[in-house]
Amino acid sequence: MSNISTDLQDVEKIIVLDYGSQYNQLISRRIREIGVFSELKSHKISAAEVREVNPVGIILSGGPNSVYEDGSFDIDPEIFELGIPILGICYGMQLLTHKLGGKVVPAGDAGNREYGQSTLTHTPSALFESTPDEQTVLMSHGDAVTEIPADFVRTGTSADCLYAAIENPDKHIYGIQFHPEVRHSVYGNDILRNFALNICKAKGDWSMDNFIDMQIKKIRETVGDKRVLLGLSGGVDSSVVGVLLQKAIGDQLICIFVDHGLLRKGEADQVMDMLGGKFGLNIVKADAAKRFLDKLAGVSDPEQKRKIIGNEFVYVFDDEASKLKDVKFLAQGTLYTDVIESGTDTAQTIKSHHNVGGLPEDMQFELIEPLNTLYKDEVRALGTELGMPDHIVWRQPFPGPGLAIRVMGEITEEKLETVRESDAILREEIAKAGLDRDIWQYFTVNTGVRSVGVMGDGRTYDYTIAIRAITSIDGMTADFAKIPWEVLQKISVRIVNEVDHVNRIVYDITSKPPATVEWE
């Protein structure tokens, strides 16, 4: 399966060299928010390769290394001679100092180790234009610059950092010891904007509107008169890919939508009505609910459930694809976060590139990934720009195995229905309360636990439904959402009154870690 990726070679860009910082993606995203395309590159990139990429600016990221240690991440020194503006952040500043003849020592030796917010005091500089002379920044460094290279000047200090900002304005090389990409640095975005627009002279015209035009042109050139196959799940990513491809190549796109009977309430109809109706996507629907449920009968182990569903999805998709003729391309909703490891090689940023949907590698298609340069928030913005409604663009994350992993133990139609109906009530009430954009993810779980209850004059022995709602920034860590009690009460009352075989509601107040977001 060969791969045809998004080509943004001609787009004005700032590259971020990856030195292992946990904030690498954040730097790239902040630059994009300013209106300049940005992507991560390996710190091993050569000066010749940088010339080929032709960026308007280069950012050296932070990282966990010390520049004076053997094996620390390095840089091709010829990059400093290219005449391209450079901004070194934290480790990036220490690295450029070290390579250009300055001195870096363990901060403990210099008595100026810094972690947390600090007050930066700066002198006039293009980098700090239109920001206060004193401002709050986030410091996070165990080493410190004690001597700066020749022809550099100091432009910033803090209480514990003699050289918090340095620069060689003639060569357009800048270094800052703090992290402007995080919100704790109050004027960080202004500093990055000054670098991108004033120092690098970028136009700041990167937008989803431009991206759509470029992608449509690229897709048409790549596909020609051939047909493209897309596995449509109804999720945000595959839906946006579908609408974008439809806009580019019309009926040359064929979508396969596998309804495995494990979707949320009304989801299958919504996919067909909205994407097939309003947007005119050519959708082949595979009604495979009985096939999946038969395979899952008697299975309680969550990993076994996942494996069965994954394998069966491949079989169903392959069955449907084999009926189609003259299909040359397979489209996928792969995002930039899925493929970052192709441009970087530090342990902190490697993320396994996944073959979305688990499709077999021996399928004879060329791969098209129109979103593989975009972050999730940009995909949502793209969907909005394409005219897609909020209820699709802002759809909740949904696991590939669907409701199967929100039913503890063996899956039955009865259990699935309790989750499907209770989840619909939860989503409706969260939206009514205006909390749907504040909560990262929310859903219900059939715990598989039955308990005694009283309804009317009779005794019941029915299922316990758990509500899971979390707040998060990146999904790596999470806290339970502090939903107002009156909203929870309304949700609880509605579920026990409107959903059969349920007599008890509990609220999951566990953070991640120790718990995961999903129960299985």
From Swiss-Prot:
Function: Catalyzes the synthesis of GMP from XMP.
Residue ranges constituting the GMPS ATP-PPase domain according to the UniProt record: 206-395
PROSITE patterns, per database record: GATASE_TYPE_1, GMPS_ATP_PPASE
Catalytic activity: XMP + L-glutamine + ATP + H2O = GMP + L-glutamate + AMP + diphosphate + 2 H(+)
Disulfide bonds: none
Stored Pfam families: GATase (PF00117), GMP_synt_C (PF00958), NAD_synthase (PF02540)
Keywords, ordered alphabetically: ATP-binding, Glutamine amidotransferase, GMP biosynthesis, Ligase, Nucleotide-binding, Purine biosynthesis
Quaternary structure (record): Homodimer.
Protein name: GMP synthase [glutamine-hydrolyzing]
Pathway(s) annotated for this protein in UniProt: Purine metabolism; GMP biosynthesis; GMP from XMP (L-Gln route): step 1/1
One GO CC term on file: cytosol
Residues binding ATP: S233, G234, G235, V236, D237, S238, S239
High-level lineage: Bacteria, Bacillati, Bacillota, Bacilli, Lactobacillales
Matches recorded under InterPro entries: Class_I_gatase-like, GATASE, GMP_synth_C, GMP_synth_GATase, GMP_synthase, GMPS_ATP_PPase_dom, NAD/GMP_synthase, Rossmann-like_a/b/a_fold
Domain Glutamine amidotransferase type-1 residues, every copy: 13-205
Residues at the catalytic site: C90 (nucleophile), H179, E181
This enzyme's EC code(s): 6.3.5.2
GO MF annotations in UniProt: ATP binding; GMP synthase activity
Domain of life where this protein originates: Bacteria
PANTHER family noted in UniProt: GMP SYNTHASE [GLUTAMINE-HYDROLYZING], GMP SYNTHASE-RELATED
